[in-house]
Regions:
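Secretory-pathway glycoprotein ectodomains that are cysteine- and/or Ser/Thr/Pro-rich
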Residues: 2-285
Length: 285
């Protein structure tokens, strides 16, 4: 959506880059246009850099009660800061919001909800677990339809469009608003095959029956897209789109595998915003 540009009164009409699925010449990856994946740490579409990185999760607390402050501060890999935060926790009465670096809402809940702290702890775990990446494989990823600006409503569906400049093996890891983790791809042996360079790849698949259906929990999902130069054996232990928690056996398999990645790896993160539909209890006809 163009509301982001319009709301900021851009003085000159920008030339919007084509979506991956509509860009067979990969114009969007042309460094002349300024779209190379620079080493930034957060945002709707981000890339990990090969340089040393700070994996600490920096959290700012606004009007937070002492018990909640203590619970957040006790999480491994979390540092409480006054500025330059990765996450902000804002408490008002019994309500609390978890916000991203640009003030975008990740989840809104009651202050006694343990899932709030679980979400913070899970993102800190992801920060520590992800390997340092580079642009060696030319990874580019986004949601499709791209006109939605990574924002979808309950019962809508979408896919991730991925393009590579070099052949690679893909993995998508979802962190949902409640702190749950899911390996979205690969979920079966047929998906652990090399993806060719050049052509756009729809993940999980181009068939509408394979598209991702938006359901609860709603908020902001942080989806990490990884491209590996070589096949990674640990992915065979993660069959099925099973939701898991930090500290589970599945999380241990993933952390151990990512700690011993062989070959080049590229990493990008896409934040997907989802909202409940008015009066909808299910996505049935």
């Amino acid at each position: 959506m163009n509301w982001f540009l319009e709301s900021r009164a851009v003085p000159q009409h920008p030339q919007l880059l084509p979506a991956i699925a509509e860009d067979p010449q990969d114009v969007g990856s042309n460094p002349f246009l300024g779209t190379t994946h620079s080493p930034v740490s957060t945002g709707a579409l981000t890339s990990a850099a090969a340089a040393p990185r700070d994996v600490t999760m920096h959290v700012k607390l606004e009007a937070v009660t002492a018990p909640l402050r203590a619970s957040i501060a006790a999480q491994s890999g979390v540092a409480i800061v006054d500025h330059d935060a990765d996450l902000t926790v804002h408490e008002s009465g019994q309500q609390v919001q978890l916000l991203g670096p640009a003030g975008d809402p990740i989840v809104s809940t009651v202050s006694s909800d343990p899932k709030l702290v679980q979400r913070i702890a899970a993102q800190a775990w992801v920060n520590r677990t992800l390997p340092a990446g580079s642009d060696a494989l030319g990874l580019r990823a986004e949601t499709d339809p791209g006109s939605r600006g990574n924002t979808f409503v309950q019962c809508e569906s979408f896919v991730f469009e991925v393009r590579l400049q070099k052949p690679a093996y893909l993995m998508l890891l979802d962190l949902d608003p409640q702190g749950g983790l899911t390996v979205l791809y690969p979920t079966r042996s047929s998906e652990r095959q090399v993806v060719d360079a050049g052509a756009a790849k729809a993940i999980p698949g181009s068939d509408p029956k394979q598209h991702i259906l938006v359901t609860a929990p709603f908020g902001t999902d942080q989806v990490t897209v990884l491209a590996f130069e070589r096949p990674q054996e640990f992915l065979a232990e993660l069959n099925g789109a099973e939701r898991f928690a930090v500290g589970s056996g599945r999380a241990e398999v993933l952390a151990r595998g990512l700690a011993h990645v062989s070959g080049a790896v590229s990493v990008q993160q896409v934040n997907v915003n989802t909202y409940a539909g008015n009066g909808k209890d299910s996505c049935g006809p």
